[in-house]
């Protein structure tokens, strides 16, 4: 009897990708095969995103495609928290579960397509099945979020903060390193709040006591001999404690902090505690400790109540802070978000669009000027793509998929996952160009 085959669709953020990896690891450990195509598979699982209307539409379309091409579909993920929405559009799905419901997903799979007898558990690698390239992996340290930003429905979808004990996280990281992973990307909904919900619970790791805390996690990961990159860091004061580890080279000099805006009025409406003057001073202090630091952030323009003055404050903040990487989103109303009940004036779509373009032009100018300063330097670069002596990689200041790249020429063949020294010869708005030395 051949093993049952399951096709898998993973939508949304890196946190959802980790959920998908866990489900696929469970499937493989029970003898299921993973199919790249819906047609011919015994079942399709769709891990959905439900944060923005555009993401909900994409998820519903993916479910429809799976039903058309296969017919047997199990839905999980954030949109699964709203089963009525899914059933209204697609009444024939086999089962619907919410996010992080790994056991419920597996139960639904067992009911629809029972596993083959005597699965070969040893076919599953110790680090589990990963959907990223072999040389980097996402490490999820917690679920949920206890903040109540008015534009966000993550707490409603994924619940309040639930931190993984630090020994569990470090064991997973160790398995990843032993499997050859060269870069670990730490993710959660609120990385710097790690351990707060369990009162920074202590655990034993390598014969010493460590706390379930952002600082301890950073220090221990920094001793594993790989690149460690911190994502989704909320700007709490204790983030300052981690900057010296970056200056020492323990973890990458990179902070992904979603500031969202700079206007005090908009931040208040967003229920975000940060203030533009304080964040500017914080960034300046971080750079004094670690001059090599790169800051990435995301911002929302066109938030309800945002005035031209508010937007100008944001542009001025960009000029002052000069962060290395910035993404920008036009505000979309999210069903269930508190922002819908604030009674604020909506920003017209054409103004949102114009502000988005102005923001991107401003940040492009800043990025271009900062990257010019890299020309002539020799930088370590991790190779993401290689074709003989031509390749593409990333510096310590760039995360995969969301940041810039280094386009490389080399005398010797390049290999994906290698970290090579590159002399930077040129730059443009977002990328660098250089020669491996």
From Swiss-Prot:
- Top-level taxon of origin: Bacteria
* Cell compartments where the protein resides: Cytoplasm
List ligand-binding residues for [4Fe-4S] cluster 1: 13, 49, 78
**UniProt cross-references to CDD domains, sorted A to Z:** Radical_SAM (cd01335)
Function per UniProt: Catalyzes the methylthiolation of an aspartic acid residue of ribosomal protein uS12.
Q: Which residues bind [4Fe-4S] cluster 2?
A: 145, 149, 152
Species: Brucella anthropi (strain ATCC 49188 / DSM 6882 / CCUG 24695 / JCM 21032 / LMG 3331 / NBRC 15819 / NCTC 12168 / Alc 37)
What is the protein name given in its UniProt record?
A: Ribosomal protein uS12 methylthiotransferase RimO
Which family does the UniProt entry place this protein in? Belongs to the methylthiotransferase family. RimO subfamily.
Q: Which gene encodes it?
A: rimO
NCBIfam families according to UniProt: 30S ribosomal protein S12 methylthiotransferase RimO, MiaB/RimO family radical SAM methylthiotransferase
Cofactor binding description: Binds 2 [4Fe-4S] clusters. One cluster is coordinated with 3 cysteines and an exchangeable S-adenosyl-L-methionine.
The UniProt keywords, alphabetically, are: 4Fe-4S, Cytoplasm, Iron, Iron-sulfur, Metal-binding, S-adenosyl-L-methionine, Transferase
Catalytic activity, as annotated: L-aspartate(89)-[ribosomal protein uS12]-hydrogen + (sulfur carrier)-SH + AH2 + 2 S-adenosyl-L-methionine = 3-methylsulfanyl-L-aspartate(89)-[ribosomal protein uS12]-hydrogen + (sulfur carrier)-H + 5'-deoxyadenosine + L-methionine + A + S-adenosyl-L-homocysteine + 2 H(+)
For activity, the cofactor(s) needed are: [4Fe-4S] cluster
């Amino acid at each position: 009897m051949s093993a049952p085959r399951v096709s898998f669709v993973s939508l949304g953020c890196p946190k959802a990708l980790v959920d998908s990896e866990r489900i696929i690891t469970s499937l493989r450990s029970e003898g299921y095969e993973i199919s790249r195509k819906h047609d011919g598979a015994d079942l399709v699982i769709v891990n959905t995103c439900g944060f923005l209307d555009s993401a909900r539409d994409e998820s519903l379309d993916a479910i429809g495609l799976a039903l058309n091409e296969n017919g047997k579909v199990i839905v999980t993920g954030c949109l699964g928290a709203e089963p009525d929405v899914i059933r209204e559009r697609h009444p024939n799905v086999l089962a619907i579960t919410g996010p992080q419901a790994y056991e419920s997903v597996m139960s639904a799979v067992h009911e629809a397509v029972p596993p083959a007898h005597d699965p070969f558990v040893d076919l599953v690698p110790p680090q589990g099945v990963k959907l990223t390239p072999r040389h980097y992996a996402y490490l999820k340290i917690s679920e949920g979020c206890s903040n109540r930003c008015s534009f966000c429905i993550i707490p409603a979808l994924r619940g309040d903060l639930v931190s993984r004990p630090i020994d569990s996280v470090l064991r997973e990281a160790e398995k990843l390193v032993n499997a050859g992973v060269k870069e670990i990307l730490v993710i959660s909904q609120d990385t710097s709040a790690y351990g707060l919900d369990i009162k920074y619970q202590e655990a034993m790791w390598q014969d010493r006591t460590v706390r379930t805390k952002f600082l301890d996690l950073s220090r221990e990961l920094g001793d594993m001999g790989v690149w460690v990159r911190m994502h989704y860091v909320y700007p709490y004061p204790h983030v300052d404690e981690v900057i010296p580890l970056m200056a020492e080279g323990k973890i990458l000099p990179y902070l992904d902090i979603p500031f969202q805006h700079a206007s005090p009025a908009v931040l208040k409406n967003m229920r975000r505690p940060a203030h533009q003057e304080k964040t500017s001073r914080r960034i300046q202090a971080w750079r004094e400790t670690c001059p090599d630091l790169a800051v990435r952030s995301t911002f929302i323009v066109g938030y309800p109540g945002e005035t031209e003055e508010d937007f100008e404050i944001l542009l001025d903040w960009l000029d002052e802070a000069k962060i290395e990487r910035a993404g920008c989103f036009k505000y979309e109303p999210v069903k269930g978000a508190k922002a819908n009940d604030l009674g604020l004036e909506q920003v017209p779509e054409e103004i949102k669009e114009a502000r988005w373009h102005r923001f991107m032009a401003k940040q492009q100018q800043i990025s271009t000027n900062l990257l010019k300063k890299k020309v002539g330097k020799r930088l370590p670069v991790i190779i993401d793509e290689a074709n003989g002596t031509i390749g593409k990689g990333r510096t310590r200041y760039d995360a995969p998929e969301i940041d810039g790249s280094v386009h490389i020429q080399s005398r010797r063949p390049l290999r994906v996952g290698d970290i090579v020294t590159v002399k930077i010869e040129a730059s443009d708005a977002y990328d660098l160009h250089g020669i491996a030395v």
